[in-house]
From Swiss-Prot:
Transmembrane stretches, start-end: 15-35, 53-73, 136-156
Keyword hit for Membrane: yes
Biological process, per Gene Ontology: response to hydrogen peroxide
Family annotation (Pfam families): UPF0114 (PF03350)
Subcellular location: Cell membrane
Protein name (record): UPF0114 protein YqhA
Membrane association type: Multi-pass membrane protein
Similarity comment text for this entry: Belongs to the UPF0114 family.
Organism: Escherichia coli (strain K12)
Alphabetical UniProt keywords: Cell membrane, Membrane, Transmembrane, Transmembrane helix
Domain of life of the native organism: Bacteria
HAMAP family for the chain: UPF0114 (MF_00143)
Main location: membrane
Gene Ontology CC: plasma membrane
Length: 164
């Protein structure tokens, strides 16, 4: 009975495979939105104010960072929790594949969230005259919470690695 339960639990990790595949579909949706934004901006590029263009560019950078985060979570999560990726030697392989454990992934995700939050906060500040003060305050508080959380996670990771 114990062996059966252990084997069943171990096999259940494959339930994550469709979830990671779903992230690849989310990546397709993000890419479509990215190019929709570019197509929307190009006809108006010469009549746009510089600040409006910068806001669009920040939005594109934001989407790119989210896309990178999706790829990192998708591949690292799959390799850490489901199965090793068998990529043929002839194909280009990302140099970090197989080297990122769950803790490294967590720290990279935290750093990515801080970067994404920074871009979002910059976009908000560029349009600060149209944003109520209390909303600005909450954006800053939330961003600082992300920064502090990432710092604490990195610090705790460093402590545990140093003690082992």
């Amino acid at each position: 009975m114990e062996r059966f339960l252990e084997n069943a639990m171990y096999a259940s990790r494959w339930l994550l495979a469709p979830v990671y595949f779903g992230l690849s579909l989310a990546l397709v949706a993000l890419a479509l939105k990215f190019f929709q934004e570019i197509i929307h901006v190009l006809p108006n590029i010469f009549s746009m104010a510089e600040s409006d263009l910068i806001l669009v560019l920040l939005s594109l950078v934001d989407m790119t960072l989210v896309g990178g985060l999706l790829v990192m979570v998708m591949f690292s999560g799959y390799e850490n929790f489901v199965s090793q990726l068998d990529i043929s030697e002839n194909k280009e392989k990302l140099n970090w594949l197989g080297k990122m454990d769950a803790t490294s992934l967590k720290n990279k995700v935290a750093a990515s969230i801080v970067a994404i939050s920074s871009i979002h906060l910059l976009r908000v500040f560029m349009d600060a005259k149209n944003v109520p003060d209390n909303k600005l305050m909450w954006y800053v508080i939330i961003h600082l919470t992300f920064v502090l959380s990432a710092f604490v996670m990195g610090y705790l990771d460093r402590l545990t690695r140093h003690n082992h």
